[in-house]
Amino acid sequence: MGRGSGTFERLLDKATSQLLLETDWESILQICDLIRQGDTQAKYAVSSIKKKVNDKNPHVALYALEVMESVVKNCGQTVHDEVANKQTMEELKDLLKRQVEVNVRNKILYLIQAWAHAFRNEPKYKVVQDTYQIMKVEGHVFPEFKESDAMFAAERAPDWVDAEECHRCRVQFGVMTRKHHCRACGQIFCGKCSSKYSTIPKFGIEKEVRVCEPCFEQLNKKAEGKAASTTELPPEYLTSPLSQQSQLPPKRDETALQEEEELQLALALSQSEAEEKERMRQKSAYTAYPKAEPTPVASSAPPASSLYSSPVNSSAPLAEDIDPELARYLNRNYWEKKQEEARKSPTPSAPVPLTEPTAQPGEGHAIPANVETSLPETDPQAVTAAGAAFSEQYQNGESEESHAQFLKALQNAVTTFVNRMKSNHVRGRSITNDSAVLSLFQSINTMHPQLLELLNQLDERRLYYEGLQDKLAQIRDARGALSALREEHREKLRRAAEEAERQRQIQLAQKLEIMRQKKQEYLEVQRQLAIQRLQEQEKERQMRLEQQKQTIQMRAQMPAFSLPYAQLQAMPAAGGVLYQPSGPASFAGTFSPAGSVEGSPMHTMYMSQPAPAASGPYPSMPAAAADPSMVSAYMYPAGAAGAQAAAQGPAGPTTSPAYSSYQPTPTQGYQTVASQAPQSLPAISQPPQSGTMGYMGSQSVSMGYQPYSMQNLMPTLPGQDAPLPPPQQPYISGQQPVYQQMAPSSGPPQQQPPVAQQPPAQGPPAQGSEAQLISFD
C-alpha cells in the first residue's frame, strides 16, 4: 500500500458509487494519476478494483470495470502485469458465469476482447489471448470490436540506472557525494547536476520531482518566440492535404472594405439617434415620476459647426443626397471621441424587452420589398422603454423573470436587425437610408451593456456556486477524514482498553499466584506444625508408655513379702537373723524397710499409694503367677565370687565391680524363707557396728551387699541392653562381706569370722538355694 492509499480509496469509492448516474471521469483520471506518479502501488490498486468488480451491486461492478479499463489504458506496464495474468482472467471468467446483469457481462466480454487485441504481440501476456480464444470456443458472443478501443498509449517513467559516477560531470559517488536519479530520463546524477524540480506531464507526474538540468530545460522551455516544428504535429495532419494549403487568411478586396466602412458609419448613426431618443424619453419619464435625474450614458451631441472641421469622407454619399444631420455622422473623429466618453461614463441598465415581439420574416429567407413598410416606426422607442422598465424590475429584485424577458426581447431585436440587413443587401439599398435598421441598431446597442452585465452576474453566480460546490466537496472530504480519525481514535481507545484489561489480568494473575504461593507456604507451615505436634504427642505417649513399662518392671523387680514382720521376730535365732519392725510403717504385701528408699521415686510412689485391700505377693501381679521354684531372696555373693561372675560375661556395670547385680525373683512369703533359713543361712556372730541399721532390734547385723541407691539401680532399668546376670555363686566362708569393704569411715573396719556354709542342694531352687535378707544402709 502506497502513501496515497487513503486518497485512492476515497477516489475509488467515489468513482464506483452506486448513486452515480454516469461515469465519474474526473475521479477515474485522478486514480490514474495516483498510480502513474507512484503514490499508489499498482498491485494494491488492482486488488482494490477487483474487490469492487466482485461487488453484489451490478452498478458498482460496472463502474469498477470502467475504472479498470481506464487504469489499464493509462498506467503502463506495471498495471498490465497485474491484470494480464492467469488469476485475473480466471476471476473474470468466474464473474461472467455468476453475473446475470447484461451490461456487466457485455463489459467483461468487451474488456477481454480489447485486451486480447492490444496484447497480441506480447508473449508474456499470451494468457489473455488464450482466454479470449477459449471463451469464443465456449460460445460466448463478443460485442462489436473497434480497433481504436484497444489503443493503449501510456508512457511511463523510465527505469532507474545504477552507476558509480555522475552521468553528466563524471564525479565519483562516495560518502559526501550522494546518488540522485532523474525522474524524466532515469539516469543517475550528483546533487549539483540534479538540483532542479519540475512536473512531468507526459508521465502523469503532476507534482514537482527531481530532474536533471537538461531535462528541466527541455520541460520548461518558453513557448513564445519558438515556432512549432513539424515533428510536434501529429502524423495524420502532416499526411493530409490540409497541411499543403496556406494557413493565412484570404485578402479582402476593395469592395468588401468599403462595405465594412459603411456598416460602421451606419452603426454610429443609429447609436447617435438612439441616444437622442433615450434622452427625450428619460425627460418625459422623470416628469411623470419626480426623481433625481440619473447621469445619462453620453451627453447630447454639440452643434455640428463647432465639432466638425474635417472634410466629409469620400466613401459617404454626395452632399446633395445627404441631409445636414447625416453629415455629422460621417465624421470619424467625433465618433471615436464619443466612444471614449461612453467608456469612461457609467452605462445605464438595459431596457425591458417588448412583451409582444414585432413580426419578423423567416430566418435565412430573402425579405421582399414591402417588408420595409410592415415594420412600425415606433419599434426603437418601444424597445428602449422596455429596456428601462426591465432595468427597474431587475433593480427591484425580479431577476429570473426579467432575465428571461430581456433575453427574449434581445433575441427578437437581433433577429429583426439581421433580417433587415439581409433585405437591404438583396435589394442593393444602402443601410444609411433605412431608418428601421438605424433604430434597431440603436436598441441593440442600448441592450448590449445590460447583456454584458447579465453575463458578468451569471459568471459571478457560477463562480459562487462552484465555490460552494468546492466547499461542499472539502466538507465531505473533511467529514470523511474526521470519520476516519474518529474510527482510528476509537480503535486506539479500544486497543488501550484491551491492553489495560490485559495488564490488569496479568497483575491479577500475578497477585493470585503470589497468594497461592503464600497459601501453600502457610499450609506447609501448618502441616509442619501439625506434624511436630503429632511427633511431640507421640513422643509424650512413648514416654508415658516407657514410664509405665519402667514402673511395671520396677514393681515386678521389687520383692513382695506377704508375711508380717511379727512372724519374722518369732523365728528361732539359730535359723537366721531376726528383723525387728523398727522402721516406718510399711504397706501390706510389700517390702519397704525404713531409711532405705527415702528420697527415691519409688519411695514417693509407694508412700502416695493407698494401702491395698488384700495382701498378696505384689499388688499389680496376681498371686498365681508366683513361681515356687524361684529363690525367695536376693543373693549377694562375696567379693571373689562377684569378680569371678563379672569376668564371665559383659553384663553388669563396670563402675562397681565389687557386687553382682541382683535378679528379682518372686517369693511365696516369709514362711518359706523362715522355714529354710535355719538350713541355708550360716550362723553369724558379729558384734554390732555403730552406724548400721537393720531390722534386728537391738542387734545390728552386717550383710554382704552394696548400698541400695539410684546409681546402683540404673543398670536394672528397662532399655539397658544388659544381658542377664550370671548365676549366683554360693557363699564361701572365710571371705569378708561386701558391706565391710564399703563401711563408712566413722569406725574401724570390723572383722567377720568365717561362717560355715553348706553347699546348696540339687533340688528345686526354692528349697536348696541360700537366701539372704536385704538390709538397706
UniProtKB/Swiss-Prot annotation:
The modification Phosphotyrosine is found at Y308, Y329, Y334. GO terms for cellular component: early endosome; early endosome membrane; multivesicular body membrane. The modification N6-acetyllysine is found at K207. SMART domains: FYVE, VHS. Zn(2+) 2 binds at C182, C185, C212, C215. One of its GO terms (molecular function) is phosphatidylinositol binding. InterPro entries: ENTH_VHS (IPR008942), HGS/VPS27 (IPR017073), HRS_helical (IPR024641), UIM_dom (IPR003903), VHS_dom (IPR002014), Znf_FYVE (IPR000306), Znf_FYVE-rel (IPR017455), Znf_FYVE_PHD (IPR011011). It is found in: Cytoplasm; Early endosome membrane; Endosome, Multivesicular body membrane. Residues 223-319, 338-370, 645-698, 712-777 are annotated as: Disordered. Coiled coil: none annotated. Residues 258-277 form the UIM domain. Phosphorylated on Tyr-334. A minor site of phosphorylation on Tyr-329 is detected. Phosphorylation occurs in response to EGF, IL-2, GM-CSF and HGF. Ubiquitinated by ITCH. Residues 452-570 are annotated as: Interaction with STAM. The modification N6-succinyllysine is found at K549. Its main location: cytoplasm. A zinc finger (FYVE-type) spans 160-220. It holds the Pfam family FYVE. One of its GO terms (biological process) is receptor internalization. Keywords: Acetylation, Cytoplasm, Endosome, Membrane, Metal-binding, Phosphoprotein, Protein transport, Transport, Ubl conjugation, Zinc, Zinc-finger. It is a peripheral membrane protein. Residues 443-541 are annotated as: Interaction with SNAP25 and TRAK2. Component of the ESCRT-0 complex composed of STAM or STAM2 and HGS. Part of a complex at least composed of HSG, STAM2 (or probably STAM) and EPS15. Interacts with STAM. Interacts with STAM2. Interacts with EPS15; the interaction is direct, calcium-dependent and inhibited by SNAP25. Identified in a complex with STAM and LITAF. Found in a complex with STAM and E3 ligase ITCH and DTX3L. Interacts with E3 ligase DTX3L; the interaction brings together STAM and HSG, promotes their recruitment to early endosomes and decreases STAM and HGS ubiquitination by ITCH. PANTHER family: HEPATOCYTE GROWTH FACTOR-REGULATED TYROSINE KINASE SUBSTRATE. This is Hepatocyte growth factor-regulated tyrosine kinase substrate. It comes from Bos taurus (Bovine).
